[in-house]
């Protein structure tokens, strides 16, 4: 008897344990009975908020959905700007489940991979459209914040964008099919949502960010070569200007040297002329005071200059006036 009571107590405890489930903070729970979702009066799946809840053991199971903000990294992709220039854009998306019932039905049981595939394709389509309306300068500077904001709003609202928007019908069709599935599951009791928006999947895009923007390899090399050519042209221009300035300085220096030498030569000639004139004046004054003595001195200097040379032979007439002071010393008095 005692063993039976213990067994019953154990069974009751196990049943109670299996009848209780806890939805953690940051999660939501959806109950399935025999594999089918429990629904409310509007035929929408029942969603359990965080807390302690009960279920029928062995009959009902609970599917947990993550209510936290999810981050989805996008592979760097090539986009074309308004200027028909290619850019490699690396980005990520932050999203969360805004309508758990719709999300569960639209994704075929809360399949996060299916939701992210649709979100990624729609995001790529929307980002391609926005980048196609901007030039490179707007994308990499002031317009980046506005660009991501417009992409986020377009994803949430389902905006069709401008006439030149590049669309991916497959993604939109998949979202539209998911929205139709939700309508069919709920028998039209849920509000109709724009099938082009992510709200049709029960998803809200919280944030869109561009991590980095790069140029394709071939474009980067072309820009590098152009920049190098421009720098080399600037260097050549500076070298040419330097050589021109050097030539100017050398020409100026040569001119100054020539001018200084010419001026010195002119001053020297003037001074020599003045000296010669002064010497001539002195000679003239001396000659006027004693012409005979002056003539005698001049003759002595002539003798000295004549006999100091290397030649030891002089051919002259004996009657030459050159020897008058040698013949007759008194000739100085004539």
Swiss-Prot record:
Query: Could you list the residue ranges forming a coiled coil in this record?
Result: none
Major subcellular location class: membrane
Report the membrane topology from the UniProt record.
Single-pass type II membrane protein
Q: Which SMART domains match?
A: PHB
Localization, per the record, is: Cell inner membrane
Disulphide bonds in the chain = none
Which regions face the Periplasmic side of the membrane? Answer: 24-334
- UniProt xrefs under InterPro entries: Band_7, Band_7/SPFH_dom_sf, HflC
Q: Which BP terms does GO give this entry?
A: response to heat
Q: Where are the transmembrane segments?
A: 3-23
Q: Which domain of life is it from?
A: Bacteria
The residues the entry assigns to the signal sequence are none
Q: Which UniProt keywords apply?
A: Cell inner membrane, Cell membrane, Membrane, Signal-anchor, Transmembrane, Transmembrane helix
Residues on the membrane's Cytoplasmic side span 1-2
What effect is documented for mutating residue 145 to A? In hflC9; stabilizes overproduced SecY but not overproduced cII protein
Which Pfam families does the protein's record reference? Band_7 (PF01145)
GO cellular component terms attached to this protein's record: membrane protein complex; plasma membrane protein complex
Which PANTHER family does this entry report, sorted A to Z? MODULATOR OF FTSH PROTEASE HFLC (PTHR42911:SF1)
Assembly and partners? HflC and HflK interact to form a complex, originally called HflA, now called HflKC. HflKC interacts with FtsH; complex formation is stimulated by ATP, and with YccA.
Q: What's this protein's function?
A: HflC and HflK help govern the stability of phage lambda cII protein, and thereby control the lysogenization frequency of phage lambda. HflKC inhibits the SecY-degrading activity of FtsH, possibly helping quality control of integral membrane proteins.
Query: What protein family is recorded?
Result: Belongs to the band 7/mec-2 family. HflC subfamily.
Additional notes on this entry:
Integration of this protein into the membrane depends on SecA, SecY and SecD but not on SecB or FtsY. HflC is unstable in the absence of HflK.
For this entry, the protein name equals Modulator of FtsH protease HflC
Q: Which organism is it from?
A: Escherichia coli (strain K12)
């Amino acid at each position: 008897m005692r063993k039976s009571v213990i067994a019953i107590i154990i069974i009751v405890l196990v049943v109670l344990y299996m009848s209780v489930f806890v939805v953690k903070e940051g999660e939501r729970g959806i109950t399935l009975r025999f594999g089918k979702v429990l629904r409310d009066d509007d035929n929408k799946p029942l969603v359990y908020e965080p807390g302690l809840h009960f279920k029928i053991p062995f009959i009902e199971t609970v599917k947990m959905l993550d209510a936290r903000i999810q981050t989805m990294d996008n592979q760097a992709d090539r986009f074309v700007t308004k200027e028909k220039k290619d850019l490699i854009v690396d980005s990520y998306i932050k999203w969360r489940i805004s309508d758990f019932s719709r999300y569960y039905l639209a994704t075929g049981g809360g399949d996060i991979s299916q939701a992210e595939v649709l979100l990624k394709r729609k995001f790529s389509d929307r980002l391609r459209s926005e980048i196609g309306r901007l030039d490179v300068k707007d994308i990499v500077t002031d317009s980046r914040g506005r660009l991501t904001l417009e992409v986020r709003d377009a994803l949430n609202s389902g905006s069709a964008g401008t006439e030149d928007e590049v669309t991916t019908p497959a993604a939109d069709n998949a979202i539209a099919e998911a929205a139709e599935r939700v309508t069919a599951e709920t028998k039209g009791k849920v509000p109709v949502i724009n099938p082009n928006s992510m709200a049709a999947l029960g998803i809200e895009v919280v944030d869109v960010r561009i991590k980095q923007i790069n140029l394709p390899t071939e474009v980067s090399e072309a820009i590098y070569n152009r920049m190098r050519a421009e720098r080399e042209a600037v260097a050549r221009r500076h070298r040419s200007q330097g050589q021109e300035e050097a030539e100017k300085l050398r020409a100026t220096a040569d001119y100054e040297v020539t001018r200084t030498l010419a001026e010195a030569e002119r001053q020297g000639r003037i001074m020599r002329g003045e000296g010669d004139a002064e010497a001539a004046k002195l000679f003239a004054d001396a000659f006027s005071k004693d012409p005979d003595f002056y003539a005698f001195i001049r003759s002595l200097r002539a003798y000295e200059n004549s006999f100091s040379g290397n030649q030891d032979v002089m051919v002259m007439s004996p009657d030459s006036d050159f020897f008058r002071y040698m013949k007759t010393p008194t000739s100085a008095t004539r």
